[in-house]
Amino acid sequence: MAQDVLTDLSKVRNIGIMAHIDAGKTTTTERILYYTGVNYKIGETHDGASTTDWMEQEQERGITITSAAVTCFWNQNQINIIDTPGHVDFTVEVERSLRVLDGAVAVFDGKEGVEPQSEQVWRQADKYDVPRICFVNKMDKLGADFYFTVRTIEERLGARPLVIQLPIGAENDFIGIIDLVEMKAKVWRGETALGEKYEVEEIPADLADKAEEYRTKLIEAVAETDEALLEKYFGGEELSIDEIKGAIRKLTVASELYPVLCGSAFKNKGVQPMLDAVIDYLPSPLDVESVTGHVPNKEDEVISRKPSTDEPFSALAFKIAVHPFFGKLTYVRVYSGTVESGSQVINSTKGKKERLGKLFQMHANKENPVERASAGHIYAVIGLKDTTTGDTLCDANQQIVLESMTFPDPVIEVAIEPKTKSDQEKLGTAIQKLAEEDPTFKVHLDQETGQTVIGGMGELHLDILVDRMRREFKVEANVGKPQVAYRETIRRKVEKVEFTHKKQTGGSGQFAKVLIDLEPFSGEDGATYEFENKVTGGRIPREYIPSVDAGAQDAMQYGVLAGYPLVNIKVTLLDGAFHEVDSSEMAFKVAGSQVLKKAAQAAQPVILEPIMAVEVITPEDYMGDVIGDLNSRRGQIQAMEERSGARVVKAQVPLSEMFGYVGDLRSKTQGRANYSMVFDSYAEVPANVSKEIIAKATGQ
């Protein structure tokens, strides 16, 4: 049995490692696990042997897709690490990890600085107010520039970096760091086998001035936020190491400053001081404010829970994974109280009872069973039947619903056709399991063709889902070409649209009459629909109102122009009529559906398409070709800048124009340019494109 869970929460850190796709995040995590004694042999991403990349596809592709939770120990402290993917297609993994973390290590590539993906992940961390420290990695790489990277953190992220280490040497001569808090050099001599030992020495003479300059900046930054330290500093007194660390910690936990460290995880340099910084500066569960939620079915009744074992039990399910032996694993963050394995709790989001089977603390895909789950920790649970991502589990007698998570809709879809009858059955199981694991994976049946259509966040995302269907669920299927996930919406408000549903066949008939307003709507947190009931005086019995709402939502699945989902609308039910005998829930559902279609047709419907933020890095010589090509793809150039000797073009381009871009870019620039893209927003398509989309969808 590994070390048990720590009950002193001041010694616990729940952290994520976040970064751009190739900044060296998984390698950094591997080194952490090695130095904290979890691994006896270092796993390399490029050998396909890393601990946190435990799915076959991850090991083959050398990228991290699922955020594995890993527990390790450092200097009597417990660190629970979530390794998040940096590839844009897997934003959902990053988003749900950040929701349950207390702090994070942002890893940057020392040559590239802040890249588009790092920017996106940084913004997601801002959304959840996650304190961070920055690790400038790959300092051994040709062209690595620590000071440039620090500048990009300030300029591109608008953050306040606090440099607490400087590199000694660069590229092949990178041998260690200067610790500006302790004013000592930490040097890894030679290629020490695995970097376990480093020497603490005096600062090299040629770097003494630079160290003094950055030390002064550091002291001034921390002193100006604390009156007592400021007086001491201006009085000419030295601040103690503990005072400096305490002040840095306070500023980091408040997300006012972001300490910046450096190293080379691959060359085993700088990882242990980074672990010290995780303990010294990132928050423990006790530093984080009480978690708030509401009473079930009463959203305005806010309640909170302190991160204490004395409070009633509450936890958030943030990830579902399928384990080869145990089946469904649910990862939970426990916010308050304790619970024994085998206990019965309630899923307050769904109002269903659940029994906790076995509880584990995970080490990538190895399990360490524990008897009890307690506040401040992350666990994997077996045996939960109805719980999905974002659900709250809590004490049945003192219920709370914690804030859930919002996930983006898919931007790309493919049709998938099973090859045989038995594949058809297996496909059903595969889709259900994968959808449980991944809230951004959506499935629907194309009403025209009868094909199953799956949607996701990008081509790589769908590739990997299809690959998992083949490998894990043994589904053989033909996969169509990627299609863009268009949406429909309306431009203007229409008032008092009426529809009467009437059917008279032998026996009891059907009758329902409804009157609605329909208007454009954009809600908070990405909500795309609202229903308001203004019916008075029992014109429609109360029990039928939800049926009108349900009918309207059904009709939203297929828009009126080209059959794409209808979004960003508000329905107000004004009036109606019913019949004592012939009215029913079904009749009002049909009326709700039909009146919405009728109203949408009159409300200037338009088609929306996903727009991607594209960043191309190219040598100067190819700038003209790159810009011309982006313009021909209906792209809008947003900015151009210089970065490490290359030119960077930022543009917004419709996703439909970006298929096959990687090959075109390669041939236009002789393979010397590269690009990345992230989903930005939905925008109305031009009229000529709209005509083409409608013609294609309606077969005209």
UniProtKB/Swiss-Prot annotation:
Gene3D superfamilies to which the protein is assigned, alphabetical: 3.30.230.10, 3.30.70.240, Elongation Factor G (Translational Gtpase), domain 3 (3.30.70.870), P-loop containing nucleotide triphosphate hydrolases (3.40.50.300), Translation factors (2.40.30.10)
Classification via CDD domains: EF-G (cd01886), EFG_III (cd16262), EFG_mtEFG1_IV (cd01434), EFG_mtEFG_C (cd03713), EFG_mtEFG_II (cd04088)
Family per similarity comment: Belongs to the TRAFAC class translation factor GTPase superfamily. Classic translation factor GTPase family. EF-G/EF-2 subfamily.
One Pfam family cited in the UniProt record for this chain: GTP_EFTU
Domain of life from the UniProt record: Bacteria
Example of a GO cellular component annotation carried by this entry: cytoplasm
Entry-linked InterPro entries: EFG_II, EFG_III, EFG_III/V, EFG_IV, EFG_V, EFG_V-like, EFTu-like_2, G_TR_CS
Molecular-function GO term, any one: GTPase activity
UniProt name for this protein: Elongation factor G
Binding locations of GTP: 19-26, 83-87, 137-140
